[in-house]
Amino acid sequence: MMCYDNSEMLSRLIDVMANDKPLMLTSPKQRQGSRFEQRACEFLQERGLILVAQNWQQPKVGELDLVMLEKGQAWSTLVFVEVRQRQHSYFGDAAISVTAGKQRKIIKAARHFLQQNPQYHKYECRFDVIAYNTMNKKNKNEANITLDNQPNQRLEINQPEWLQGAFITSAW
């Protein structure tokens, strides 16, 4: 399953996959992050969320990894999703890496997204985090992802941790 922007819902199209080829990202870290964002998008779509935008950017403000729509019976919710991946460390897991400063940047970018997409003004909004905690793995026969900058290292991918309502904002 591929994640493409839903052109019926988004007023400004974002071409993340040109001619079915991924964008050329400059660093191995960016390429790896893009793969985890793709996995998170597929994970959320399997749970019924609809992709509105992926890698939405506002210059000098910030980026939103995923913007999803969760349709409910009474109302729908616009979900701003931050995707984080971190290898096992003693400094905390992937979810903890979404600092207060990062939360402020995401909230600011979400405000700009809503200003540029007035069709979502009346929606409830929620800020979620999808966290992937990975470990280096020695068995090369198992399903894994190869690190771009370290071809002999492989990551063991755990199920994502989906933190719904991971943080809130006091007022829009």
UniProtKB/Swiss-Prot annotation:
InterPro entries given in the database record: Restrct_endonuc-II-like, tRNA_endonuc-like_dom_sf, UPF0102_YraN-like
Pfam family, any one: UPF0102
Signal peptide (UniProt feature, chain positions): none
Superkingdom in the source lineage: Bacteria
MF terms in GO: nucleic acid binding
NCBIfam families per the UniProt record, alphabetical: PRK12497.1-3, PRK14687.1, YraN family protein
Family label: Belongs to the UPF0102 family.
Listed name of the protein: UPF0102 protein Pcryo_2198
